[in-house]
Amino acid sequence: MQPSLLDRISSVTGNRSKRHAKFRLGRLQQPPTESTTRLAISDGAQAIDETKSPRQSEPGATQCKSEGSGDDIADGPQPMPAPNEGDTPTLDELQQGPNPRGSGIVSGWKLAAVLTALSLAVFCMALDSTVLSTAIPKITAEFNSLHDMGWYVSAYNLTISSFSLIYGKLYSLYRVKWVYLSTLFLFEAGSLVCGAAPSSLALIIGRAIAGVGGAGVFLGSMIIVHEIMPLHHVPLFLSLISGLYGIASVVGPLLGGVFTDYVSWRWCFYINLPIGGVTALIIVLFVRPRARDQATVKKTVWAQFLELDPLGMVLILPAVMCILLVLQWGGAKYAWSNWRIIVLLVMGGSLALTFTVVQLWQGDRATIPPRIVRNRTVWGAIVFAVCLYGSFTVFTYYLPIWFQAIKSASATRSGIMNLPMILGVVVCSMLSGWAVSRVGYYVPFMYMAPVVGSIGAGLLTTLHVSSGPAAWITYQLVLGVGTGAGMALPLVAVQTALAADDVSTGSAIITFTQTLAGALFNFVAQSVFQSRLVHNLNAALPGVDTARVADASPMEIRSAIEPEYLPQALDAYSVSITQVFYAGAALCALAVFGVLPMKWLSVKGSRIQPVAHA
């Protein structure tokens, strides 16, 4: 039996009489006067400003605020204030029960359905990043488009990176449910265009559309999880969804190969359509949209457009694309001294600098509000996410290359051999999310990630041609356990440290930096590998033409050199890859510097939403 509103007020106000509770209830139910925007709810001068969203902790949890730079958040556990000394719940909170955050708490089988739908949507979105790796040969043969091969992957990844910040603005200003459904529609439309593509150009356009939608699907899934359950349950389910992202990275090539060999490469995209349809139906039925901020509702269309920071959007999109194209083409398709690379580098740098100036000038209307970035928990989470995810990307790409080149593994088998790391990430990610939900604090587990992860990464640098399964399985597990412990926690930290209205923007910043870091350090690793491979081959085989080995794919190096030189070539190849692992290990260790400035905040708390009046 649900307690009455009167009983809830009585329980909040401690050992007070029901008579006093009735008085407080009457005060709560009085309509606001036109001369004030504050709702008086106690005897003294106490009031709750309707424009703020402070967090009120449960007993034993951290008491904090999320205004300004975030430096006013108290460190460590704080006792609950007496009823007359702290924040008092609003009428909406007392009517809704505990944790009335965002769109409303979902529980039971409805919660399970929503979480399953979100997980499947993120899985499909992540799958699209790697599913084409084994299907590209068939696609290029069908369209006779070998020169377009790079764009099949880049068109998707570029748009995901570029649009992440824009969706942060949209989710903060409009109802999360409807923005999410719009992005899901875009992702599905892009998948349909790709599946039915009659030409290479149509496939590239479809990939770009899917990327625009995919950026919003991933970010929106994280935000919906934050809105439909109490804050202390969020870490577990964010970790679950992040783990699925890792699984999709490995399963993608396997699934793409199965579709290509037994059905058609077009099913790499058609598979998204029924899953997206089911996800949309569940979101429509079970997720209650968050009420829009009344100040935003009352603004004109033009004023709302200005709130989206259109100037910032115009600058950030080409800036990111220029920088990523420089990293993709530089030293590979074109020399670093080529005029195309120089022009892109100058344009990207100039646009990025101009974007920074615009963000400082725009203030709270900026795509990346300076006050949010100044919050030390937020910028610590950014540093942590960049280093940890960059390290994870390096090992995700180059461990399979080591297996293919050194152990003669096929693409499919190399993915299977990479499973110890992925399983370690997924399992430990879920365990750390569960532990944070139980303990309340995420900082200890964020320290665990770079410490354990860098040990595993360091061990992987010792791999050599004769290393057996015992070595590479154990080392991968250690790396996976460390990486998994912190994979989802930057989002948890940001969502805990910020006020409810800033969560979508903070989450977008973390998602953007993670995606950009993955692309950035993948290209950096590629540059390191190519330069070290040429150097090591020339040092191991002086006087021998090693250009064919340097240009060969990992599975072709045995046929690219004479048998008598193969042992030295394999050793040089292995050393070149482990030298890339040094960069990954260093990145993983540097993630600890992102944890140091973070405040010890507890997830065992709830936000008090402002009372909205029509």
Curated annotation (Swiss-Prot):
Glycosylation, residue list: 15, 375
Database matches in Gene3D superfamilies: MFS general substrate transporter like domains, Multidrug resistance protein D
Example of a GO cellular component annotation carried by this entry: plasma membrane
Entry-linked InterPro entries: MFS, MFS_dom, MFS_trans_sf
Localisation per UniProt entry: Membrane
Biased composition (Polar residues): 30-39, 56-66
SUPFAM superfamilies hit by this protein: MFS general substrate transporter
Transmembrane segments: 105-125, 151-173, 185-205, 209-229, 236-256, 267-287, 311-331, 341-361, 382-402, 416-436, 439-459, 472-492, 509-529, 577-597
Principal place of residence: membrane
Region of interest: Disordered: 1-99
Membrane topology (UniProt): Multi-pass membrane protein
Biased composition (Basic residues): 16-25
Keyword NADP appears in the UniProt entry: no
Protein family per UniProt: Belongs to the major facilitator superfamily. TCR/Tet family.
Function in brief: MFS-type transporter; part of the gene cluster that mediates the biosynthesis of calidodehydroaustin, a fungal meroterpenoid.
Protein's name according to its UniProt entry: MFS-type transporter ausY
Upper classification of the organism: Eukaryota, Fungi, Dikarya, Ascomycota, Pezizomycotina
